[in-house]
Amino acid sequence: ILNYIKKIDPSLDLKVVELTSGVNANELLASGDVDANYFQHVPYLKDQEKALGKTFAVAATVHIEPLGIYSHKHKDFSSLPENATVAVPNNTTNLSRALFLLQAQKLIKLDPKFTDPATTLATPKDIVENPKHLKILEIESPQIPRSLDDVDLAVINGN
């Protein structure tokens, strides 16, 4: 998106730096190594502000990367066994988004106070119903696709 904008208006002094996994763009921003970043939704930004002890300005909101539920073992949710293991991202905001996605598929139910994934952050402790007794396994996001053979379901971030 940013490279497209740069092509439309070459007068912009915009240097786009693509980061590899494991690099925290907010740490780069906090240290002054970059002037801005473009990748996160507001709940994640707020979580990062707390973690880094910094306050960042929001110039504009961005799209939210989709999450998907994948499996090498099951073709549909009805074939999911009792005590199935579900890999989810271990970072606060994507973990919450994963739980909301599992709830949307009627695999779990969150405490009713969690109504909007854009404004509330749920954790596994907020699961109030888990009819199949799913085991929620929190894993580093980049490792989740590699875990597909070892888990029943994996919630994977689209980026």
Where are these regions (language model features)?
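Short helices/loops that flank or line small-molecule/ion binding pockets
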Residues: 23-37, 50, 100-101, 122-157
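A conserved helix-loop-strand patch within extracytoplasmic ligand-binding domains
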Residues: 59-109
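Short secondary-structure boundary segments
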Residues: 41-42, 158-159
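Short, polar/charged alpha-helical segment
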Residues: 1-13
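Short beta-strand-to-loop elements that line the ligand-binding cleft
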Residues: 13-20, 111-119, 133-139
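Ligand-binding "clamshell"
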Residues: 47-59, 73-74, 150, 155
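Extracytoplasmic "Venus flytrap"
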Residues: 1-3, 21-24
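Short beta-strand-centered segments that line the small-molecule binding cleft or hinge
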Residues: 34-37, 55-61
